[in-house]
Amino acid sequence: MSVKELKERHMAATQTVNDLREKLKQKRLQLLDTDVSGYARSQGKTPVIFGPTDLVCCRILQGHTGKVYSLDWTPEKNRIVSASQDGRLIVWNALTSQKTHAIKLPCAWVMTCAFSPSGQSVACGGLDSVCSIFNLNSPIDKDGNHPVSRMLSGHKGYVSSCQYVPDEDTHVITSSGDQTCVLWDITTGLRTSVFGGEFQSGHTADVQSVSISSSNPRLFVSGSCDSTARLWDTRVASRAQRTFYGHEGDVNTVKFFPDGNRFGTGSDDGTCRLFDIRTGHQLQVYYQPHGDGDIPHVTSMAFSISGRLLFVGYSNGDCYVWDTLLAKVVLNLGAVQNSHEGRISCLGLSADGSALCTGSWDTNLKIWAFGGHRSVI
């Protein structure tokens, strides 16, 4: 068989797969007689209402000299680590706004950072294709820099996201531009499992984000530039447990819902979507039309402790607070006093749900606290 014939057969097979996928999508839509917001309205649910003092900017963390790309909270809620275009990780005291650590990175092109569950170490990765681990208790060297305690090398593309396995300081999961995710043993520095790559059920484009289930740490979700999200079990690296379709652009961010049975995705297509890992169904779409026709990309997301609220950062500087039940925007932090002056690149909620931190290309991080009659939702 000639190369031309092989290409033609491959194209025909690809078209058949796409046609079947579209038929499956339409059949699911026929069987799905309602979505989350439709059911909530039928039950008389009303939107969450925010007053002017219910979520206010209480801290501005200034110290980076470049765009802020990533942030993460410690489990005890008092500290934040941020990664910036200036080639530094900064650990902040969220209560006082003071910097407790400023780590100059071997590679300035950092894209992601994460706190360990104990809060004793931080991980980061970027265009050097390495996930670097720093022990915050290690003494600094003669030049005043924190030494790298472990370098996790093996990816063949940039490291786009990293997250420690809950309740473990010894394992971290990374996603990469090489279309794979990797589970690492930090103690040995070796790869425990590789998800994707040569396996056909893996992603077919750069993987942008991972989220590990807090209720079942063996499960994690990945989002990719192939417009899909995939559910993985760390015990079965050879295949994805389920693939979730629906987006029409790169999936930039994924986040598990608090109950561990659902997860959210955010995409370049301007939408966030809520999926059920048990049925594979899309439960809800969160999209706010813009009159100018411009569609801002979704860059980051986080659920409130109860899951009733969804915080979403956008490329145009908006930061919407969505009511997840009714799919309504109840607040836009990009339109209030002290809002960011650039793209919202990252955000995260404190462990107790009492504060939200946002990071931006304006080089600043801002901490937003629930006030008024709300303490957490």
From Swiss-Prot:
One of its GO terms (molecular function) is signaling receptor complex adaptor activity. SMART domains: WD40. The keyword Repeat applies. Pfam families: WD40_Gbeta. GO terms for cellular component: cytoplasm; heterotrimeric G-protein complex. G proteins are composed of 3 units, alpha, beta and gamma. This is Guanine nucleotide-binding protein subunit beta-2. It comes from Nicotiana tabacum.
